């Protein structure tokens, strides 16, 4: 595939394991470029994937361009899967697999409009699969508790038998590994400052969110700034309009068709300005298309989620809340 790098990530892991002394502890991060953009146009269909079987998220128009773009994305995800498969096989061949914590995850959501570089589910919810036969009871469980990727740091520290520093605000997953139900894992707290420098002065778009089972509440600290980057490509480090969103066939189509009926609303959600507060009722609106902040019937929920978020930000000493005037 033209867009997939020729880096042999799994082969690099093999070389690393060859250099590790016998019985010595090790840590390795296998980070691939895939599925970062750009993709080979038409790669998905070329591998026999059927566009008709694609489940198109409601945040995108449903047409042949978008379906093909998603299939091309799948090709690169499968390449990552292949590298992970080979790495796991290497651990098994060397007898390390059962005593190694294997974590498979991602740093953000899919590189599409209103996904990556946003606090909506398509931007912040990522896969997380953990394998550790000697440390996880009842393996194969589908755990519904909210976790953060920052929880991995105290988890690794505790698994190694060391004390977790009190300054860490994240929580170890070891109790989940042991099968305990965690009553305090009923929400996820999400933060973003910027992706690329795509606004005047290189400024970001600071926002914070709390995600519960039923609601997503977002607070945008600078609603006067363009959330997806300025429409003026001259102020973007990548010289593209709305540069927080990676260039793609989906983005191009939505920009070119943003005045058309049925697409204008989706384009506004992806590229337009956003209010200071956003609230989404996930039972009625799982893909977060209708902001109900400001509606009378949701005022109590909005107030409660705002207080929940800001209590957490104060507790964790977020500089946007406790640091005085912030210049960036």
Features from the language model and the residues they span:
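Active-site-proximal cap/lid insertion segments
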Residues: 1-4, 17-168, 203, 216, ...
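Short hydrophobic-aromatic micro-motifs
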Residues: 211, 216-219
């Amino acid at each position: 595939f033209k867009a997939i790098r020729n880096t042999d990530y799994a082969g690099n892991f093999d070389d690393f394991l060859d250099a590790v002394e016998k019985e010595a502890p090790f840590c390795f991060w296998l980070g691939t470029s895939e599925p970062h953009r750009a993709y080979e146009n038409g790669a998905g269909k070329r591998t026999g994937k059927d566009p008709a079987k694609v489940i198109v998220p409601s945040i995108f128009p449903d047409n042949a361009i978008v379906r093909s773009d998603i299939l091309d994305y799948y090709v690169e995800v499968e390449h990552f899967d292949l590298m992970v498969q080979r790495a796991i096989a290497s651990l098994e061949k060397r007898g390390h697999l059962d005593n190694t914590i294997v974590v498979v995850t991602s740093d953000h959501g899919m590189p599409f409009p209103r996904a990556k570089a946003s606090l909506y589910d398509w931007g912040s919810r990522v896969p997380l699969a953990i394998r550790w036969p000697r440390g996880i009871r009842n393996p194969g469980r589908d755990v519904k508790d909210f976790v953060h990727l920052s929880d991995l740091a105290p988890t690794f520290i505790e698994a190694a038998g060391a004390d977790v520093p009190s300054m860490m605000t994240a929580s170890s997953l070891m109790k989940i590994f042991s099968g305990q139900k965690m009553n305090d894992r009923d929400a996820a707290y999400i933060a973003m400052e910027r992706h690329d420098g795509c606004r005047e002065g290189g400024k970001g778009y600071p926002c914070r969110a709390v995600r519960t089972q039923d609601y997503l509440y977002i607070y945008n600290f600078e609603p006067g700034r363009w959330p997806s980057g300025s429409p003026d490509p001259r102020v973007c480090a990548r010289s593209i309009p709305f540069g927080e969103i990676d260039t793609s066939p989906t983005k191009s189509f939505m920009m070119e068709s943003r005045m058309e009926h049925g697409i204008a609303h989706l384009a506004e959600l992806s590229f337009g300005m956003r209010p200071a507060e956003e609230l989404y009722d996930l039972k009625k609106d799982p893909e977060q298309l209708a902001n109900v902040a400001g509606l009378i019937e949701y005022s109590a929920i909005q107030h409660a989620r705002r207080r929940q978020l800001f209590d957490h930000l104060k507790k964790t000493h977020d500089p946007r809340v406790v640091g005085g005037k912030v210049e960036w």
